[in-house]
């Protein structure tokens, strides 16, 4: 008798065919990678096909692969990752779609398929700058409206670009350039044979 994950994998391969760029099992979960051009069609089929039945989107996030694998990674930089749940079939699926342009990452919105994607897509836009084409209200959700950049991108400076503080003379919050100085932290090297009673 086939396990639940083997059944799901067989159903996905039969339903999606060549539209599945890859389908990998790791840590007891399947990850499906699809092209951005097939993304909406595949998402609808994942929801509507009774052999799959993913009626719930439980999470969606952005990923920046710029420094993935210590810089050895040579694929697209940004991806949107969905986590889907089928209550009827009691199985889960991770779906990954890569944006083709690293400078302006654009991925179709799945809000019309799973309305729970609304705020998740806004969060991925706010933090990673991934534009979800067709989203009804794509605006920042976590950072300030005047915020510059996208803070979860790997090239975003740790200290940010500006800092805000309350100015008692102006009686309002003001923005100013960052005043934090970058520091080089040198790791401590212990050169003793016995440190803290430990034998080497």
From Swiss-Prot:
Entry EC number(s): 7.1.1.-
Database matches in PROSITE patterns: COMPLEX1_30K (PS00542)
GO cellular component, one term: plasma membrane
Catalyzed reactions: a quinone + NADH + 5 H(+)(in) = a quinol + NAD(+) + 4 H(+)(out)
Entry keywords, A to Z: Cell inner membrane, Cell membrane, Membrane, NAD, Quinone, Translocase, Transport, Ubiquinone
Enzyme class, spelled out: translocase
Membrane topology listed for this record: Peripheral membrane protein
Subcellular localization: Cell inner membrane
Molecular function GO labels: NADH dehydrogenase (ubiquinone) activity; NADH:ubiquinone reductase (non-electrogenic) activity; quinone binding
Function in brief: NDH-1 shuttles electrons from NADH, via FMN and iron-sulfur (Fe-S) centers, to quinones in the respiratory chain. The immediate electron acceptor for the enzyme in this species is believed to be ubiquinone. Couples the redox reaction to proton translocation (for every two electrons transferred, four hydrogen ions are translocated across the cytoplasmic membrane), and thus conserves the redox energy in a proton gradient.
NCBIfam families per record: NuoC_fam, PRK06074.1-1
Family of this protein: Belongs to the complex I 30 kDa subunit family.
Subunit composition and interactions: NDH-1 is composed of 14 different subunits. Subunits NuoB, C, D, E, F, and G constitute the peripheral sector of the complex.
Protein name as catalogued: NADH-quinone oxidoreductase subunit C
Organism: Burkholderia mallei (strain ATCC 23344)
Gene name of the record: nuoC
């Amino acid at each position: 008798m086939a396990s639940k994950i083997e059944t799901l994998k067989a159903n996905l391969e039969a339903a999606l065919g060549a539209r599945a760029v890859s389908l990998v099992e790791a840590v007891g979960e399947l990850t499906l990678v699809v092209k951005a051009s097939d993304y909406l069609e595949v998402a609808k089929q994942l929801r509507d096909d009774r052999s799959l039945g993913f009626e719930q989107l439980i999470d969606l996030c952005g990923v920046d692969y710029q420094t993935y694998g210590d810089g050895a990674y040579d694929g697209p930089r940004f991806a949107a990752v969905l986590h889907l749940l089928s209550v009827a079939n009691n199985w889960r699926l991770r779906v990954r779609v890569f944006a083709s342009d690293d400078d302006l990452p654009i991925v179709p919105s799945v809000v019309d398929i799973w309305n729970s994607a609304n705020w998740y897509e806004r969060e991925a836009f706010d933090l990673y700058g991934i534009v979800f084409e067709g989203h009804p209200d794509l605006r920042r959700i976590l950072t300030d409206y005047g915020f510059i950049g996208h803070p979860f991108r790997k090239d975003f400076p740790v200290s940010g670009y500006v800092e805000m503080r309350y100015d008692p003379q102006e009686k309002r919050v003001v923005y100013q350039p960052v005043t934090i100085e970058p520091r080089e932290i040198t790791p401590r090297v212990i050169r003793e044979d016995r440190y803290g009673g430990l034998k080497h």
